[in-house]
């Protein structure tokens, strides 16, 4: 749990065939928030509108920012979307979170300058789902939460010509994910009944490289979380 590289399993099996239906997709990153509806009724997924809706979420980094304020910001864009049917939500959440069977996740800590303390240790998906369903006449049927690296990892599976995959993010922050055989992950709870390849969020931004310089030490010292995310602070957009 306190390891430098946490290797957080995700209990959502990827699918590359027989996918059908529509889903609302949310992407909350270190800087931007994006919303779109994805239609899987054809061989190639269709995004409506073409590039989705986008909003700058730098306000999340404000001192004293609350969960209620965050949920309202997220909901305001969703309420404006015209839907004629119920659908599930896929939530790409770009912060360290512990995935649980069923598709939700618990926030472990904030990174990238965000610090909404009341959300740490709490579920990410279900409270947002309840909040949205209280404010939408046409309900959402469920929610699945994945890290942005896991989403990138799954996207790579659309090209099946490779024998190994890595989901890499280098943006406001940095992180990566990959597939690891379930029998090699000793910390997996036996009740999960996991088998085959498991998508794992490495949380590699917390790696502490041995080659950092005095400049890196200065950046770390004046950051909001000294001693943590040292690799991220050395290479990602927020700190560069």
What are these regions (language model features)?
Residues 11-48, 80, 99, 165-182:
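Gly/Thr-rich phosphate-binding beta-strand-loop-beta motif of the actin/hexokinase/Hsp70
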Residues 1-17, 143-147, 151:
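Charged, flexible boundary elements
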Residues 1-12, 47-48, 54-55, 107-109:
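Charge-rich, low-complexity intrinsically disordered linkers/tails
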């Amino acid at each position: 749990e306190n390891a430098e590289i946490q290797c957080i399993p995700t209990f959502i099996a990827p699918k590359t065939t027989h996918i059908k239906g529509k889903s609302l997709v949310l992407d909350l990153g270190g800087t931007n928030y994006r919303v779109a509806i994805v239609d899987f009724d054809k061989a190639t997924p269709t995004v409506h509108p073409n590039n989705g809706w986008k909003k700058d979420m730098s306000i999340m980094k404000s001192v004293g920012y609350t969960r209620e304020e965050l949920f309202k910001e997220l909901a305001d864009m969703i309420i404006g979307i015209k839907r004629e049917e119920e659908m599930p939500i896929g939530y790409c959440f770009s912060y360290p979170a512990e995935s649980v069977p069923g598709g939700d996740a618990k926030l472990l800590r904030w990174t990238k300058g965000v610090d909404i303390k009341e959300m740490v240790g709490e579920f990410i998906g279900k409270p947002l789902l309840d909040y949205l369903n209280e404010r939408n006449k046409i309900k959402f049927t469920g929610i699945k939460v994945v890290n942005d690296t896991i989403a990138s990892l799954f996207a790579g599976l659309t090209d099946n010509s490779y024998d190994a995959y890595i989901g890499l993010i280098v943006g406001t922050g940095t992180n990566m994910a990959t597939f690891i055989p379930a029998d090699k992950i000793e910390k997996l709870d036996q009740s999960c009944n996991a088998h085959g390849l498991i998508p794992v969020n490495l949380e590699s931004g917390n790696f502490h490289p041995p080659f950092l310089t005095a400049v890196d030490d200065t950046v770390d010292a004046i950051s909001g979380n000294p001693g943590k995310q040292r690799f991220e602070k050395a290479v990602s957009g927020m700190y560069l």
